[in-house]
Regions:
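Extracellular glycosylation-rich, acidic/polar low-complexity regions of adhesion-
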Residues: 1-112, 161-170, 206, 217, ...
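Surface-exposed beta-strand/loop patches in extracellular or lumenal glycoproteins
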Residues: 25-30, 124, 173-177, 182
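Short, T/G/N/S-enriched strand-turn elements that build extracellular solenoid repeat scaffolds
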Residues: 110, 122-134, 138, 148-166, ...
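Feature marks extracellular polysaccharide-active and adherence modules
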Residues: 119, 141-143, 175-177
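Low-complexity acidic/polar repeat-biased segments
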Residues: 180-232
Length: 232
């Protein structure tokens, strides 16, 4: 069984079998979060766009013979409502799309007991998502095999996903190895500062990134040797 934020194949319901085989296919997926990602099984790029108002993903320009090769990630169990249509550049079946659904039932959700775990070769670019889908996090684990990236992490992102301690501050720890990467993004008046610290037992080194807003101090400890720094 797959866990949340691991690559999972998009299985289309059987009542979508009558699609006519035109050159390109489009999908609308409702039920996946803003953190969802898409790719083909062979690593090919899937062009996708998220409508944050209607909470719908649109997947574009998929070759008909690749429709069953689409993989996705999501943070938790859900039902995905699917609409599919074809276009050859002139004619389109969008007005009468095929419809279906997929039940997504993960063995483990992405966030459990405050720990947010990413699967193999899953990346999150915070500049491309809407805050609010992931909450209550105090630890992010990037240690799955392969490269995992957290990109463009702002103060607002950490405020959104983190949980406050009794003093009203947020402490987040990011675990991983040399294959992984974390980048922070400065904003006017909200710049990150960093220094190197040990854990409580003196066994591990971390780069500790700090930022402040009002009475809240945000601290993000990134395990070395994760590659980390400020986005240009």
């Amino acid at each position: 069984d797959k866990n949340a934020f691991e690559w999972t194949t998009l299985n289309l319901n059987a009542n979508m079998k009558d699609l006519d085989g035109s050159e390109k296919m489009y999908l609308e997926l409702k039920g996946l979060g803003a953190f969802a990602q898409f790719k083909l099984k062979d690593g090919g790029i899937v062009e996708s766009e998220y409508d944050s108002v209607n909470k719908v993903w649109t997947i574009k320009d998929i070759a008909y013979d690749k429709i069953n090769d689409i993989q996705f990630t999501n943070d938790k169990d859900t039902t995905v409502d699917i609409k599919a249509w074809t276009t050859d550049g002139i004619d389109s079946t969008r007005e009468k799309p095929a419809t279906g659904f997929m039940e997504v039932d993960f063995a483990k959700n992405a966030v459990e007991n405050g720990k947010f775990t990413l699967g193999k070769e899953v990346n999150i670019d915070f500049s491309k998502i809407v805050n609010g889908d992931i909450q209550g996090v105090n630890k992010i684990d990037l240690s799955a095999e392969g490269e995992n990236k957290l990109l463009n992490l702002t103060l607002e992102d950490v405020l959104s996903i983190g949980t406050k301690d009794v003093k009203g501050n947020i402490n987040l720890t990011i675990l991983g190895d040399s294959d992984d990467k974390v980048t922070f993004k400065n904003e006017i008046g909200k710049e990150w500062s960093s220094n190197v610290v040990n854990d409580d037992k003196g066994n591990k080194l971390y780069t500790e990134w700090s930022n402040t807003t009002g009475d809240t101090t945000v601290t993000v400890k990134v395990e070395q040797p994760i590659s980390d720094g400020i986005t240009n």
